[in-house]
């Protein structure tokens, strides 16, 4: 996929993003938002996580096949989330709206306990998140992984994700402010 410099790609983004905007406050918001991202950059196993400061994380939405659910979600919630560089970043005054795992882990991911005890078994080779800060210090992350057969994000793909980060982060925040979402989370 190309950067959003070509008019047809930009047009697709506008159309897909409009679908997500129309779905704000409904159950179809996260699927529509992920569809918009996928229209720009290939992503695998998208997951939306709510991080509370004093509670374990909660998966709000995912597109993980059944065979990978245990390694992607269940094992994560058993405790490795505390070592997750994304979780730690999210709970410590994050400044950016997008992060890439290799950059957050400062190139030391494969030497970490988190990698040995959890991440190495997930079957993913790269990951990036869109981060949205909510009131009260809570955070929602849209996690986007890459499987080995698709390779890590290229610099151009990550640059494209970077361009998408502001509107996506803001939309997630606005979605969280809708009554139906707030009442159930």
Language-model features, listed with the residues they occupy:
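Signal-transducing coiled-coil/dimerization helices and immediately adjacent hinge/linker segments
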Residues: 173-185
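Regulatory input/activation interfaces that engage signals or partners
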Residues: 5, 12-24, 28, 32-138, ...
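A contiguous pocket-lining binding segment that forms or flanks enzyme active sites
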Residues: 156
């Amino acid at each position: 996929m190309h950067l959003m410099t070509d008019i047809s790609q930009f047009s697709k983004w506008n159309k897909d993003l409009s679908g997500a905007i129309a779905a704000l406050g409904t159950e179809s918001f996260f699927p529509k938002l992920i569809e918009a991202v996928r229209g720009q950059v290939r992503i695998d196993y998208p997951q939306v996580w709510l991080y509370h400061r004093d509670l374990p994380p909660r998966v709000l939405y995912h597109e993980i096949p059944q065979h990978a659910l245990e390694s992607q979600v269940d094992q994560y919630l058993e405790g490795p989330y505390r070592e997750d560089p994304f979780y730690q970043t999210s709970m410590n005054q994050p400044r950016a709206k997008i992060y890439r795992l290799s950059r957050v882990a400062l190139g030391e991911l494969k030497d970490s306990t988190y990698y040995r005890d959890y991440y190495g078994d997930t079957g993913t080779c790269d990951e990036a998140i869109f981060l949205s800060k909510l009131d009260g210090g809570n955070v929602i992350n849209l996690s986007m992984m890459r499987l080995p057969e698709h390779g890590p994000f290229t610099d151009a793909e990550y640059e494209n994700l970077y361009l998408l980060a502001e509107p996506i982060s803001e939309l997630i925040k606005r979605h969280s402010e809708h009554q139906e979402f707030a009442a159930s989370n």
